[in-house]
Amino acid sequence: MFEATATIDNGSFGTRTIRFETGRLAQQAAGAVVAYLDDENMLLSATTASKSPKEHFDFFPLTVDVEERMYAAGRIPGSFFRREGRPSTDAILTCRLIDRPLRPSFVDGLRNEIQVVVTILSLDPNDLYDVLAINAASASTQLGGLPFSGPIGGVRVALIDGTWVAFPTVEQLERAVFDMVVAGRKVDGADGPDVAIMMVEAEATSNVIELIDGGAQAPTETVVAQGLEAAKPFIEVLCTAQQELADKAARPTSDYPTFPDYGDDVYYSVASVATDELSKALTIGGKAERDARTDELKAEVLARLAETYEGREKEVSAAFRSLTKKLVRQRILTDHFRIDGRGITDIRALSAEVAVVPRAHGSALFQRGETQILGVTTLDMVKMAQQIDSLGPETTKRYMHHYNFPPFSTGETGRVGSPKRREIGHGALAERALVPVLPSLEDFPYAIRQVSEALGSNGSTSMGSVCASTLALLNAGVPLKAPVAGIAMGLVSDDIEVEAGDGTKSLERRFVTLTDILGAEDAFGDMDFKVAGTKDFVTALQLDTKLDGIPSQVLAGALSQAKDARLTILEVMAEAIDEPDEMSPYAPRVTTIRVPVDKIGEVIGPKGKIINAITEETGAQISIEDDGTVFVGATDGPSAQAAIDRINAIANPQLPTVGERFLGTVVKTTDFGAFVSLLPGRDGLVHISKLGKGKRIAKVEDVVNVGDKLRVEIADIDKRGKISLVLVEEDNSAPADAPAAAPADATS
């Protein structure tokens, strides 16, 4: 058994210890590592590879799975069969966090199936497992003898009291204004060893605005850039520990066959026949027209080279795509113009409108160029919040953001149905962007479901979803703390030959940052950088890069460029709606009241009898929390008020007095009399001797039955609070009508 340890020093915030161990568990896997975070957190990562390649695949078949075991938290799964089922959202998002830096680290052209399975064995509820899983997956892959350019280190850093803290606990995150997951690897830079950042997933916390108001540092673009730099030393320590383990226990790298997308001879032939016409086609502004022309050219090239490269049609197609990529990048780097004619900082045409779906509680349509997003908001009682049964710290989710990407959004056919990992990831990104500006439960006692429908896609539907969702939430009457917009940035870089004044030529590394990237620019560029935020600070950020590091000044420039675009988009959104609308008449009106905790049982009643009766009779929905908070919802005010009055009558009763008169309902008959409901939870007895109006009766049911209305007066209240009633003659003065209580079992 071999071990390696990384110590994370957070100064006054203490230290965290990450320990990697191999040789004890999963010995038949190509590479297996047990990773520990301090003493309480333990997970196993196992990497395996198929023996033969999938030659017919035109992609790298890497699969990452995260298996949450509920025994890790000492719990039995809540499902019907009491065993784990489909992966939770947290597990799926962790799979994506692992996949994004791992995939580009394998050699190009690899077609053997690679599977990484991470199993959560033990978890302290005060810790998160996702970042530990990134390191474990990298370490196990490093040991497996695979063509892998790792190791990769992953760290979560949170801005707490002005300090970037690595591997923060859940408790510490409550004091953070911003946290980010950063993954990267060690490289040799121009100025010595450095860390190349490969992936970033970041967000402002839910209480960021309150913390800023209290004097905390706002997560501006400058602060976020500082956080990325602060993560690098921690990543270096983690990579060093993984490399130490690999030096002791890694298998020799096996000779895996690779399948290049095309041969050099194919590329030269395609370039010679297609460059001129393809360059012209790539200046067409409209996506549909441009795609149609490039498809036509591709067909011509395939036909022209069919005889020369018979049986190598896939290589011709791949070479045509590579030529397209080269021409797109070349025009950006040399001319600073893009395939749709825009400059590098130009945003496509924007439009925004609200109230586009008639009966929805809130809706909006946001369009940026050919990317079109429909946002729809639904409000409901807090009890409709999502119940979460996973290893994460969240047990309920009040704000749920769901993203749908149907195939027609790109003019194609395909499968529809349950969401894929990409859709779950995009929905989670948009959700994180909006959570920091949502009103508190006290200010807005609703569960909120936000759905983003991608109706048209040509670049960054996730950031379009952020914009459409802000508009729809405001249209639904949700009092957001600030509007949020998002934009996708891109980066193109290359070594460009430049000529000096003396005529000498040299290569110069040139970076060009693009604002509002198209789908093609995303595919052909070096970076996908999505930034969402308010006019004052960043709320969410996602970065994926194919480069071995991005210079700090380039990244800072991209963040600044993104803010300029965000402010422009916010202005367009404000023209459509700049403050919350009145709530839809179809949305429930939810009111919050409080009752004493010791009265909760009385409000609910035996087997829910009282609360069910109030719900049935008033039409209101009622939800009671353990702390005595009661949410009452109804589509009209009178129904909600009637339910509130009934609840208050039980929880905060005003005791009736002798002489008061009521119109009550008979709720129970006995041999000795009839019990009449006066107020919710408050009954009185009309003795059998008082029912006959002076005449003797043999049986109570001969005079009254359950459900009958009786006008009664309180004749006496004994020391135990039991109420004796007498009938009131019809010609007497009118009694005080009280709302009838829900029938309740009375005791003699």
UniProtKB/Swiss-Prot annotation:
Its EC number is 2.7.7.8. SMART domains: KH, S1. One of its GO terms (biological process) is RNA processing. SUPFAM superfamilies: Eukaryotic type KH-domain (KH-domain type I), Nucleic acid-binding proteins, Polynucleotide phosphorylase/guanosine pentaphosphate synthase (PNPase/GPSI), domain 3, Ribonuclease PH domain 2-like, Ribosomal protein S5 domain 2-like. The keyword Transmembrane does not apply. This is Polyribonucleotide nucleotidyltransferase. Residues 588-647 form the KH domain. It holds the Pfam family S1. Mg(2+) binds at D522, D528. Involved in mRNA degradation. Catalyzes the phosphorolysis of single-stranded polyribonucleotides processively in the 3'- to 5'-direction. It is found in: Cytoplasm.
